């Protein structure tokens, strides 16, 4: 149905997410990651996502054949993560990131996590 969408604020140990769109077809979020913080090393079985850096400096770490590569995203650049790609975001400075994805929010397999959330999809 067309109209205003509910906006949800989700606190995270690394900052917060603002979910501004959540439908059965797609999800839109803004992630705020504090300087020096990082999301878990993770992958998704189904979820397909693309991020766009709105502000700050971000390292997007991506593993291919068990080898990590650091991609330094600059403001205005986008990066896509397809299912089964191991990845991690780390903020060099405070960052705001626009993320659009398929609606599979619980599809998170955390391999390592500095906040003790390995193996879960907990916020």
Features from the language model and the residues they span:
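Cytosolic regulatory regions built on CNB/CRP/Popeye-like sensor folds
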Residues: 1-9, 69, 75-76
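A short glycine-rich, His/Asp/Glu-containing loop-to-beta-strand
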Residues: 5-42, 46-47
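Short, surface-exposed secondary-structure edge patches
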Residues: 30, 50, 70-71
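Glycine- and acidic-residue-biased ligand/ion/polar-headgroup-sensing regions
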Residues: 46-64
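Short acidic-glycine-tyrosine-enriched beta hairpin
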Residues: 64-84
């Amino acid at each position: 149905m067309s109209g205003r969408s509910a906006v949800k604020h989700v606190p995270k140990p690394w900052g917060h997410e603002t979910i501004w769109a959540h439908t059965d077809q797609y999800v839109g979020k803004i992630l705020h990651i504090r300087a020096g913080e990082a999301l878990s090393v993770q992958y998704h079985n189904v979820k397909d996502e693309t991020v766009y850096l709105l502000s700050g400096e971000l390292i997007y770490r991506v593993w291919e054949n068990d080898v990590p590569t650091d991609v330094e995203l600059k403001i205005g650049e986008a990066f896509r993560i397809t299912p089964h790609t191991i990845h991690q975001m780390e903020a060099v400075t405070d960052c705001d990131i626009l993320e659009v994805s398929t609606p599979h929010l619980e599809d998170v397999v955390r391999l390592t996590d500095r906040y003790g959330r390995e193996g879960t999809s907990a916020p």
